[in-house]
């Protein structure tokens, strides 16, 4: 079987297509956004491959796996088990890091446990096992005549009553033991609590230190070591003298610091054996941040410098008034004019000083009470800790920030794990290195003799995995980077690297635009990785718009000709030459150069007086960057992956602007020195790829605000007025007009254990979401359900006489979404589509010409033709006087920009500098810029 046969695929918008796909080849599926590429790749081929594999398992195993819906297809032959690597961002678990996802960290733990050298944290000397004679000598160094006892640890911090243990010790002839620090008689031991942790140490010998004790001590040590498994404690019998720990395992000769045998879990921050006890292995501590609590330091306490403690909140404000009387300050003085001492007292409390507070109840009775003032920060902490209301907790969480844990300095590990070294390098140092530097470290690491032999296999696994990460262009990440902070493209390429590491053969991989977020420079390495997967003997199916990927494919499938209802057919298939030769293929026309995105004749000139100047940005890897953005221009921020684009624009510039222009209270920008020029804008809008709604009830009509005027139109018809229907009657989210059998969903979810949940159309409303009475109301001959089922294109014509609706529909068409249905569930929109719905919503708002738009990789999921449409929209925004800032790798976008800011020169620590800025023509001349190298040929 050397091909996959697909017959009659009708998933989503696919129009009963038949396909023959070669196996063990690199296949690229391309076409307009929304043409049906993902429906073919993910919802048909992957879903069926996955479903068949899962159905071969037992019913018991199936209940733990999420099953795919059976695709609407007549039959598929020649499928392999399928693995999909999608754009979904990875886990939201704060414990997930790049190291743990890629399994590199597991091998590092094993390596450190097997060949690491533990050291004493205080004296930095290697921990060595002590012989009995060394132990005896150490005891004899104590002052002559000291009364000491020698103890063997039998139970350490373990729950239970330990009756048997104590009986055994007595039977062996031991008389006394120390239990939880108290000495007691073994003939009558205390009863221990079952659910508490206990430590039991048996007293092997009691002696006064004398020089002739050698023989006796040696025998006692031998007995004790045998009982305890290698650790003996020598403690004074009277007073609080210091105890000495001796170890036949590992111990520091200076201070007796010792530790148990090294094992991999000691280096895991997800295991109590290795996690820092202060932060539980998270590396950060949460605290109420004064900068967030103080809303505006220029205001006085009475005016609301601290939200929730102003005059409107009588209970809390009377506390501040009493505080002001006691310390003699004025609640009407601006907060930043109060002395440092007073500010400290307000935030952190009055310590032990008691203050007289007046409490007035509802009846107006006054009660006087004297007690210390707890401080606003402690008050918030207490309320956060004690509340059972989620809404209160969410509200208070806005004032919380994270700081590196004070005990482990953010390394997440216990002190023992932080002090194990391989050639003077500890594990936390390695996970902080970039992946490229870590690879160099392990390639150059030289171990001696037996250690080299033990480490050989583990090192090979570590090197291979790091090499794969470098190959997919992630050399700039470090292993300790939290998975939450990765972009969709990075997360996908990490999963890709893990798959190559698995080395499977005969599998069908389905990938969704792996080139997202990758600079042209790194694209080549990614494509080599894909061909490597193919050469292992796998079928690699890639949904991709990148020209290099299409040209490199063994087989290209072009889906189209349009998007949505106008798509769903195979327009062209074959190798690249066949696609180019096919006159029907839009992709072919762009590849051959018949159609192309032109370089603009002239660019909008920069007005030197109108710029935004951000100085001294130092977030993440930024090296004191000064950013200057021209107002009223279309600016592209470029640079290799990891060079600092997102940190500079999203984490610093956008958050400052969001706070200053939109009044956001919880956006904390990355550190910077100063900013000037925001007065040129009245608002800032950030348009990203996150979903527009996570429930099937959210749809383009509700999101863009078209649904409200549509419901008002229906409520205004003669029929509605005679029945007394309000606009709410036409909402499927509230009781009244919706079908109650399915609560306005149109479908009913039937849970099938062991099989995927089945959604069946509701029998009562036949999937129309509304009850019969509501559907009797028609506007221009259409019911509300028929309107929701219209495509944007049809609705634009239908509502042409209604300007408020027509304008919003026109903007949806302008961003290339003419094919989506008004009532289409938000969960079925791709990332690129969701971003364009957001863009359309912003475009349809009244345009002041003073808006700052920030877009992060808007070309994700877009075909050449879609990019052309997107650019005309962005250029239109700019022509109205707005400022557009785009983070982008796509050269078609970069070459049409008015201004480019290029970061680099490399990713990670090798980046964080602006290395070129100016018009595309200026930037193309700069040698140091990787972007320039690829941009230059396109401008000539």
UniProtKB/Swiss-Prot annotation:
GO cellular component assignments: cytoplasm; excinuclease repair complex
InterPro entries named in the record: ABC_transporter-like_ATP-bd (IPR003439), ABC_transporter-like_CS (IPR017871), ATP_grasp_subdomain_1 (IPR013815), P-loop_NTPase (IPR027417), UvrA (IPR004602), UvrA_DNA-bd (IPR041552), UvrA_inter (IPR041102)
Binding site for ATP: 31-38, 639-646
Cross-referenced PANTHER family: UVRABC SYSTEM PROTEIN A
Keywords: ATP-binding, Cytoplasm, DNA damage, DNA excision, DNA repair, DNA-binding, Excision nuclease, Metal-binding, Nucleotide-binding, Repeat, SOS response, Zinc, Zinc-finger
Organism of derivation: Vibrio cholerae serotype O1 (strain ATCC 39315 / El Tor Inaba N16961)
Location within or outside the cell: Cytoplasm
Lineage: Bacteria, Pseudomonadati, Pseudomonadota, Gammaproteobacteria, Vibrionales
Membrane-spanning parts: none
Main function: The UvrABC repair system catalyzes the recognition and processing of DNA lesions. UvrA is an ATPase and a DNA-binding protein. A damage recognition complex composed of 2 UvrA and 2 UvrB subunits scans DNA for abnormalities. When the presence of a lesion has been verified by UvrB, the UvrA molecules dissociate.
Family of the protein in this entry: Belongs to the ABC transporter superfamily. UvrA family.
Residues of the ABC transporter domain: 309-586, 606-936
One GO term of the biological process aspect: nucleotide-excision repair
Pfam families tied to this protein: ABC_tran, UvrA_DNA-bind, UvrA_inter
Primary location group: cytoplasm
SUPFAM superfamilies linked: P-loop containing nucleoside triphosphate hydrolases
Stretches annotated zinc finger (C4-type): 252-279, 739-765
Record PROSITE patterns: ABC_TRANSPORTER_1, ABC_TRANSPORTER_2
Protein name per the record: UvrABC system protein A
Gene Ontology molecular function, alphabetical: ATP binding; ATP hydrolysis activity; DNA binding; excinuclease ABC activity; zinc ion binding
Record note on quaternary structure: Forms a heterotetramer with UvrB during the search for lesions.
């Amino acid at each position: 079987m050397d091909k996959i046969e697909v017959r009659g695929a009708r998933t989503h918008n696919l129009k009963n297509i038949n396909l023959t796909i070669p196996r063990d080849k690199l296949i690229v599926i391309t076409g307009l956004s929304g043409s049906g590429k993902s429906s073919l790749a993910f919802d048909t081929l992957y879903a069926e491959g996955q479903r068949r594999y899962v159905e071969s398992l037992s019913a018991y195993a199936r209940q733990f796996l999420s099953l795919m819906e059976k695709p609407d297809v007549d039959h598929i032959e020649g499928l392999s088990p399928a693995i999909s690597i999608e754009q979904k961002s990875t886990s939201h678990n704060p414990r997930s890091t790049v190291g743990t996802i890629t399994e590199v960290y597991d091998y590092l733990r094993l390596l450190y446990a097997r060949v690491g050298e533990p050291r004493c944290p205080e004296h930095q000397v290697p921990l060595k096992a002590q012989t009995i004679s060394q132990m005896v000598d150490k005891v004899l160094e104590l002052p002559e005549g000291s009364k000491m006892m020698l103890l063997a640890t039998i139970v350490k911090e373990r729950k239970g009553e330990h009756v048997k243990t104590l009986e055994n010790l007595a039977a062996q002839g031991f008389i006394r033991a120390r239990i939880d620090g108290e000495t007691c008689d073994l003939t009558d031991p205390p009863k221990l609590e079952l659910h508490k942790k206990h430590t039991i140490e048996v007293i092997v010998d009691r002696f006064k230190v004398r020089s002739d004790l050698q023989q006796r001590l040696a025998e006692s040590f031998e007995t004790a070591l045998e009982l305890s498994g290698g650790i003996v404690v020598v403690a004074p019998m009277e007073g609080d003298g210091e105890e000495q720990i001796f170890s036949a395992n590992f111990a520091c000769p200076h201070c007796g610091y010792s530790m148990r045998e090294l094992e991999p879990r000691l280096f895991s921050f997800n295991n109590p054996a290795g996690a820092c006890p202060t932060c539980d292995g998270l590396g950060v501590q949460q605290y109420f941040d004064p900068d967030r609590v103080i809303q505006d330091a220029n205001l006085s306490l009475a005016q609301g410098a601290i939200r929730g403690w102003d005059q409107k909140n009588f209970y809390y404000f009377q506390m501040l008034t009493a505080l002001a009387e006691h310390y003699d300050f004025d609640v009407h003085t601006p907060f930043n004019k109060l002395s440092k001492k007073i500010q400290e007292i307000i935030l952190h409390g009055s310590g032990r000083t008691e203050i007289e507070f007046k409490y007035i109840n509802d009846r107006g009775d006054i009660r006087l009470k004297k007690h210390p003032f707890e401080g606003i920060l402690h008050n918030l902490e207490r309320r956060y800790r004690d509340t059972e209301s989620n809404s209160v907790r969410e509200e208070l969480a806005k004032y919380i920030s994270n700081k590196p844990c004070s005990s482990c300095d953010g390394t997440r590990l216990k002190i023992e794990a932080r002090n194990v070294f391989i050639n003077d390098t500890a594990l936390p140092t390695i996970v902080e290195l970039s992946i490229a530097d870590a690879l160099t470290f392990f390639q150059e690491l030289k171990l001696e003799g037996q250690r080299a032999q033990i480490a050989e296999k583990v090192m090979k696994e570590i090197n291979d995995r790091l090499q794969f990460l470098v190959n997919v262009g992630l050399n700039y990440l470090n292993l300790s980077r939290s998975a939450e902070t990765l972009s969709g493209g990075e997360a996908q390429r990490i999963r890709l690297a893990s798959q190559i590491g698995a080395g499977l053969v005969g599998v069908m991989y389905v990938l969704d635009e792996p080139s997202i977020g990758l600079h042209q420079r790194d694209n080549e390495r990614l494509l080599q990785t894909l061909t490597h997967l193919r050469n292992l003997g796998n079928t690699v199916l890639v949904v991709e718009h990148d020209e290099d990927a299409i040209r490199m494919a063994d087989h290209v499938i072009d889906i189209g000709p349009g998007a949505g209802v106008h798509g769903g057919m195979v327009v062209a298939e074959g190798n690249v030459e066949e696609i180019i030769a096919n006159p029907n293929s839009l992709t072919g026309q762009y590849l051959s150069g018949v159609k192309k995105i032109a370089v603009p004749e002239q660019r909008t000139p920069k007005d030197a007086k109108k710029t935004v100047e951000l100085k001294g940005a130092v977030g993440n890897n930024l090296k004191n960057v000064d950013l200057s953005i021209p107002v009223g221009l279309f600016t592209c921020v470029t640079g290799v992956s990891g060079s600092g684009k997102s940190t500079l624009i999203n984490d610093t510039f956008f958050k400052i602007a969001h706070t200053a222009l939109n009044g956001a209270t919880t956006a904390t920008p990355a550190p910077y020195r100063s900013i000037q020029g925001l007065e040129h804008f009245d608002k800032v809008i950030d348009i990203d790829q996150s979903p527009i709604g996570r429930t099937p009830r959210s749809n383009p009509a509700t999101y863009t605000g078209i649904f409200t005027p549509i419901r008002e139109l229906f409520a205004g018809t003669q029929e509605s007025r005679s029945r007394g229907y309000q606009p709410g009657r036409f909402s499927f989210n509230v009781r009244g007009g919706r079908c109650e059998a399915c609560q306005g969903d149109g479908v009913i979810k039937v849970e099938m254990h062991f099989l995927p949940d089945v959604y069946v159309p509701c029998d009562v409303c036949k999937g129309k979401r509304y009850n019969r009475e509501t559907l009797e109301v028609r506007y221009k001959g259409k019911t509300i359900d028929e309107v929701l089922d219209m495509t944007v294109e049809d609705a634009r014509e239908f509502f042409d006489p209604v300007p408020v609706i027509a304008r919003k529909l026109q903007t949806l068409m302008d961003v290339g979404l003419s094919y989506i249905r008004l009532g289409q569930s938000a969960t079925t929109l791709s990332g690129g589509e969701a971003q364009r719905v957001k863009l359309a919503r912003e475009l349809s708002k009244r345009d002041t010409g003073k808006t700052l738009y920030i877009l992060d990789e808007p070309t994700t999921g877009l075909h050449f033709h879609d990019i052309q449409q997107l650019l005309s929209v962005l250029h239109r925004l700019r022509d109205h006087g707005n400022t557009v800032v785009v983070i982008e790798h796509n050269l078609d976008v970069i070459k049409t920009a008015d201004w480019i800011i290029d970061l680099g020169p490399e990713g990670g620590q090798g980046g964080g500098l602006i290395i070129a800025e100016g018009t595309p023509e200026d930037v193309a001349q700069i040698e140091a810029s990787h972007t320039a190298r690829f941009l230059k040929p396109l401008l000539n």
